[in-house]
Amino acid sequence: MKKIRIIFVIILFLLVIYSLWAWFQVGSRPDKIGLHRCNSLEKLEEKGGEYALIEVDVCIRENGRMDVTHDEDTTFGLDIAPYFAYLQQHDGNRMWMDVKNLNEENKEAFFLSLDSLCRTYDIAHERLIIESRRWDLMRLLTIHDFYTSYYVDAPKPSELTRFQTDSVITRLDRVAASGCVRALSFPGWWYMTLRGQYKDRDIEFLTWKHRSVQWEVFLHPVGKMMLADDRLKAILVKDKGRYHR
């Protein structure tokens, strides 16, 4: 019994040491770890300084105007322009824009508005990640050097049959081969399924672990694999703060 207690204490001690190591890694990978859902200027002020990459949800309104909101039927009256001003003041930082409602009718107005903002605030196109479910409408952005990504909209692999999973992989191969986007972006639970795919395609990966805080990425074996994967360019994490919406 005494030997079992000693082994238990040693294991517990090692777990504490490992957890502390992960905790102290927070902030050590600004090149890869970004802030998920920074949809208010208050959150940008509170948390933006801790991340070199922020993610913002955007809905396109009339004349290509970009409204910072997660849902198309909701508005907080927050224009995207202050975020470009923030990027102008923080050279080297990047912004990931999850565009919720890109379509045939607004794609050109969106491109013109985006390009105008980049010119006004002197922001290189490469500093923006433009993400949409409409990968087929992204070529115009891609050829003008915006970093574009297709939002992979699929259930968890664990909820799919093998045939359904293979169908998703095949569909994404067509996207990767199209040249319309530079990356595929997907929830973290798709990483192990997709990490070995499309190696003959010129395509990169982005992901989000929106239920995990930053230190959990360093703690979890899959998170460590993500950090070491050169094809995976960004991982968004949860950091709600006081002004999350």
Give the label of every model feature segment.
Residues 2-245:
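Phosphate-group recognition and catalysis centered on beta-loop-alpha active-site segments
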